[in-house]
Amino acid sequence: MAYKPQFYPSATKVAENRRNHINPAFELEKLREIPDEDVVKIMGHRQPSEDYKTVHPPLEEMDLAEDYVRDLVGPINGAKEGHRIRYIQFADSMYFAPSQPYDRSRLYMSRFRGVDCGTLSGRQVVELRESNLEDISKNYLVDTELFDPATTGMRGATVHGHSLRLDENGVMFDALQRYEFDEATGHILYVKDQVGRPWDEPVDVGEPVPQEKLKEITTIYRKDGVAMRDDMEVVEVVKRIHRARTLGGYCPLNEIFDTYL
């Protein structure tokens, strides 16, 4: 019988959202359509019309030694072409942002190949071959329900703000002021790239997701939303993992489980 992964325990809405994010078969809701060149502009690694820089020749032109594993696992397109590794980094407000750092790393590694994730309390960076990174950034990380222009920020440096109160327009604080709320349209406009370099023309990433919808799609446990202490199945799983790690060093010995768990 084929193994069917559970992805995440519990039946609460937050747990369901986390489960959906990690499940590669689940189709994320598309909320906006940001042009490719605008996403490239925000990332700031190359000009929209510029060719991809490479760090090695295309694989088919290289004289590589025989490798059984390489024959089993085909390269992603960026690796085939020798494209360099680049990154995108997100900060997610603790005030009901759709995603958060651990959720991002789980879903990236579950849905995409060739990713390298860095997970901190208030930021999450993912590295990938540049062409593949642009593809997932546009089609998954910005256009879908994973992104809210007000509570999610593309920030390659100086990411502070995830734990601060939202401003009067519901927008997360950004020390580098990479984006601003346009009162005339109600949209969020990026005026700098992810590391804070300013532009002459802004990039419109659309209107903020309504608060009611954020509470429906968030993966963050909050006392004024779905409190984690009330989600007993998740609490028990987390306690079990923590005890196994602390007492057994992740070594699944029966005496550890029988005695302490």
Curated annotation (Swiss-Prot):
Superkingdom of the organism of origin: Archaea
Cofactors required: coenzyme F430
Location in the cell: Cytoplasm
InterPro entries per the UniProt record, alphabetical: Me_CoM_Rdtase_Fd-like_fold, Me_CoM_Rdtase_gsu, Me_CoM_Rdtase_gsu_sf
Cofactor note: Binds 2 coenzyme F430 non-covalently per MCR complex. Coenzyme F430 is a yellow nickel porphinoid. Methyl-coenzyme-M reductase is activated when the enzyme-bound coenzyme F430 is reduced to the Ni(I) oxidation state.
Annotated GO biological process: methanogenesis
Gene Ontology cellular-component terms listed: cytoplasm
EC number: 2.8.4.1
Pathway where it operates: One-carbon metabolism; methyl-coenzyme M reduction; methane from methyl-coenzyme M: step 1/1
Keyword Cytoplasm attached: yes
Binding site for coenzyme M: R123
Pfam families xref list: MCR_gamma
Annotated catalysed reactions: coenzyme B + methyl-coenzyme M = methane + coenzyme M-coenzyme B heterodisulfide
One function term, GO molecular function aspect: coenzyme-B sulfoethylthiotransferase activity
Alphabetic keyword roster: Cytoplasm, Methanogenesis, Transferase
General function of this protein: Component of the methyl-coenzyme M reductase (MCR) I that catalyzes the reductive cleavage of methyl-coenzyme M (CoM-S-CH3 or 2-(methylthio)ethanesulfonate) using coenzyme B (CoB or 7-mercaptoheptanoylthreonine phosphate) as reductant which results in the production of methane and the mixed heterodisulfide of CoB and CoM (CoM-S-S-CoB). This is the final step in methanogenesis.
NCBIfam families assigned: met_CoM_red_gam (TIGR03259)
Family membership noted in the UniProt record: Belongs to the methyl-coenzyme M reductase gamma subunit family.
Subunit structure: MCR is a hexamer of two alpha, two beta, and two gamma chains, forming a dimer of heterotrimers.
Protein name: Methyl-coenzyme M reductase subunit gamma
Gene (name only): mcrG
